[in-house]
Amino acid sequence: ADLGCKPIVNTNGIALTPELLHELKLAGVYGFTFHIDSKQNRPGWKQADEVGLNELRYKFAKMLAAEGGISCSFNSTIFEDTLIHIPDMLKWAHKNIDIVNVMVFIIYRAVDNRDVDWYLGPKKINMGELVYNEDVPDRVDIMADEVVDVIRKTYPDFDPCAYLNGSEKADSFKWLLSGRLGTRKRIFGYMGSKAMEIVQTAYHLMYGKYLSYTRPKMNKKGRSMLLMGLFDKKLRRTFFKYIKNPFRIFRKLYYQSIMIIQPVDFLEDGRQSMCDGCPDMTVWNGKLVYSCRMEEQLKYGYNIRTYPKDLVAILEKNKIV
């Protein structure tokens, strides 16, 4: 923190206590991202589905709120059978918009051994040895667009405002961000792309970097954010919904981020489409590498390349060989 960084703790929360949280705050912790989902096989929560786990999420959110001044985020890995629970998780987050700052849904991905072979240079690799290749479900190709469709069944006006595209597939949404404004009782609207551009550009001009995590006090300034409605039509609509009841101006309006992350996609020609400009890069052996693929770095020292199993047939069909 003394170096101008924002120390964020990514954790399952099992060992966190109010006493430890207080010590970490004194040490400079900026925020917590709790990874909680029904596939973790948690002691005491093994039978709970995503909706049931909202009770556990609330425990951690209240703990951080009681300590004060610490950003509160939740991650959940989304599988085919848990996709339907996202609207209920967002309902819970809406109900606690005053203490929950960010909800992140990470779509599950697994090593694809059905359609591609893996190579390190000329050597074929058995990727079954890596830990993230266990118990692969039927679907490992859910897209961010599908998640949005599911959310809109409950929140028809749900509207993302910013994204990162794929490194190999520019029209894919790898990080898809939405920002909603509301109270515990009602969501009034969403931030538009113009407002997000203004915020990020202004922050970059002032500090030379882009805005990510914010203190909880900033998430309570939803009314101030409505001023950007002069330039952003989504916030303008939000403003008019909000002032229909003039007495609302005496209540706090909260901002809450919702992020959908779509990890690596395997394209038909074997290319791997990663997140372009990935914010979760980590330093390994003096280089920036994808943190979600550290197992390959640890075991092989490189990210492994993929080629279609029927590559020879494809090349012959195209008269390349």
Language model: regions and residue ranges:
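Amphipathic alpha-helical segments that form well-ordered structural scaffolds
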Residues: 59-63, 146-153
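Soluble, non-transmembrane catalytic domains of enzymes that act on hydrophobic metabolites at membranes
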Residues: 154-158, 162
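A structural signal for well-ordered alpha-helical scaffolds and beta->alpha junctions
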Residues: 57, 86, 140-148
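Short secondary-structure transition/capping segments
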Residues: 23-29, 59-64, 115-130, 166, ...
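Flexible glycine/acidic-rich beta-alpha junction loops that bind and position SAM and/or redox cofactors
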Residues: 42-45, 81, 100-146, 162-182
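A structural signal for short, well-ordered beta-strand segments and their strand-loop junctions
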Residues: 73, 102-105, 162-163, 282, ...
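Radical SAM enzyme core and accessory elements
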Residues: 164-165, 172-321
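Radical SAM/AdoMet-radical enzyme domain recognition
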Residues: 1-107
